[in-house]
Amino acid sequence: LEKTPRYPFVCIYGIGNALLIKNLAKHYKHLFVFESEIELFILALSTIDLSEELCSGKIYLVDIEEERVDIQLLILFDMKDMFEYLSLYEMFVNNVYYKKFYEDIWHKADELCEKNIKVVIRNLNSSLCIGFECYSHLLQNIPSMLESIPFQRILSQRKNKFENAIVVSAGPSLTKQLPLLKAYQDKAVIFCADGALSMLEKEGIVPDYVTNLDFTDLAMKFFQNKENKTSLNVLSCATHLSLVHFLDNKSVVLRDDPLYQRFNLNDFGYIDTGTHVSHFSYTLALALGFKNIIMIGQDLAFDEEGNSHSKGFSYGEQFNGEKTVPTLKAQAYAGKGEVLTHITWNDYRIKLEYLFACNEQKAKFYNATEGGARINFTEELSFKECCEKLLTKEKPQFELPKSLTKNRSDKLLVKFKEKIQKDQDNAKRFLDDALALKQILENILSKDFILPLEFLEKVYQNIENFNHSLD
């Protein structure tokens, strides 16, 4: 308590007799208690009633030996009231007994938390440049989005119409799967990450959906074949403007995020695009109700020759952009030794495992990559076995859904502009209020005499009101 005044959460190794835990819970919003032996949780709970604290989310009990502990920690640390304070993280130990006899284990718990905190915050750009750029793209893409195919029309016409999907990524293992993919392309709906598109086209394979979320224009190189008139290009609202303008047969989709939902453009949302394009493909397949999702080319690792991508990748099999990222070892597909990956791919893998674990009641995920890193919460099965087992029926053929009428899209654009104008007015008001408070605080600090308590209380209340209005 002395070290953590006003901390919103605390992590403690060891439940002990639970009396200390119950008393500490009164002082924190969340208390995370770690143990390596679930029997100790059971014993403690049999002596002290923590039911109220557990039900309210005051106390979380974490078994560090549980198979899904990484997923649990990612969910917990990604909560809004946790994420903002992760820099305060520290693992405390319940008592001297735990420190003396469980030293290795509580260090393991500490490392587990540190690892998952890094995954949660890794994509946060401290300068916010990426966030601002993506938001800028959103604002500029809105007119094109309103003229594109509404995402909700795609769902209403195609959801739950077929069970089998193949998600194609551009990893080194893809090349060996292409002949079989071509043979079975009429018996599975194909979701293709943009980087794999040219490789499929060279083999005469036409994907049903092509996904993209690049905020840079590097992906322009993937879409050079303008003869493809049947694939539906599903783009994130933050996709680079050049690509949005370049592509036909497109649906520009809003992310499943309050920032985007507040515009009330519900016909064009909402989906979890994730932070890499294959994640987008999986969430799109889930949104469309597919029950069996087969993945190929999802290596998330270098192959034995050091290749980062499949043969025929537009930027080369050994893409230079992958060589500057710090590397590490990961368990290989089917548990056959280890493979070399890097921290970005490893983060992607963990986030995919999170996605698959959260959706295992909705779909079965088959990893038919036959290479690369092992991905938990998937069934590893050869691509040939997947095809023979699941792909027995012809997939349905669909016409491309229609866009909104020009009259309706124009009306939505007018409403959107009105909303943005209100946002600008509010932003100016917040800025003016912030500058006024800053001036007052600077004046207070510059005084060499004690100011009246009533005045200071009023300033404090103004700061509290300002913070509340930001929430």
Which residues are covered by each model-predicted region?
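N-terminal donor/sugar-recognition subdomains of glycan-related enzymes
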Residues: 1-165, 172-188, 199-202, 218-230, ...
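Phosphate-binding loop/pocket of nucleotide- and phosphate-handling active sites
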Residues: 307-355
